[in-house]
From Swiss-Prot:
It comes from Fowlpox virus (strain NVSL) (FPV). Keywords: Early protein. It comes from the Viruses. This is Uncharacterized protein FPV249.
Length: 105
């Protein structure tokens, strides 16, 4: 009888002990998960800020490149126009020289 009572008491104590350990474990897990979530959110926020800053810088670089392209395109267009004018002048001069050559023959 005494053994049965002791076994019941021990079983009750063990049950309470296991329940307490499980509650502490669950509490610790929740706390750790919370800490991990906070750290992850902090890291994500930092990465997001870095990403936005880099995108902003890239957009500025792209805008600068567009402006440089426009300048280069303008210069190239003027250069091509000047070459065409010179070619027309040379054609005209060539035509005049051919006419003079024909007259000399």
């Amino acid at each position: 009888m005494i053994i049965r009572r002791n076994n019941k008491a021990l079983g009750s104590v063990m049950s309470d002990f296991i329940k307490t350990i499980n509650e502490e474990y669950d509490s610790n897990i929740k706390e750790i998960k919370s800490e991990i979530d906070i750290k992850c959110n902090s890291i994500l926020k930092e990465l997001d800020e870095k990403y936005r800053q880099e995108i902003k810088e890239l957009c500025m670089i792209v805008d600068q490149l567009k402006n440089q392209y426009k300048i280069i395109d303008n210069i190239y267009s003027r250069y091509i126009t000047e070459i065409r004018i010179q070619l027309l002048a040379l054609k005209e001069e060539n035509k005049c020289l051919k006419e003079e050559l024909t007259k000399l023959k």
